[in-house]
Amino acid sequence: MYFYCEKCKKKYPISSMNYRCECGGMFHLNKAANEETVHDVTIGHMHTDLLSIKIDGIEYLLKTENLLPTGSFKDRGAYTLINEIHHVGIEKIALDSAGNAGASTAAYAAAADIDCTVYVP
């Protein structure tokens, strides 16, 4: 598993401390086809129901994401992110967030015993 630059295709080890390529391109994660994602870090269930409502004769389906553990749909991304970095052995992360992403990531990081610093703009 390694990161590669979308722009110049340069490869970086998964343990790289860079947040982007030297050329300015963004990283993508390359995983072996047979490598499974391990999801063992959780702080609660990830199932939310669909509610059906009709407005002016049109049926709408509403997803009750507010029932996720931190009350935000951002739990889905944080769950995936933290499980992946926990799986590869990353022990410390930092992010910037004005709210839900920071709270969700910090909650899942705490469950995985990963040191998490959230910078609030």
Q: Whereabouts are the PLM-identified features?
A:
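PLP-dependent amino-acid enzyme catalytic core
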Residues: 1-121
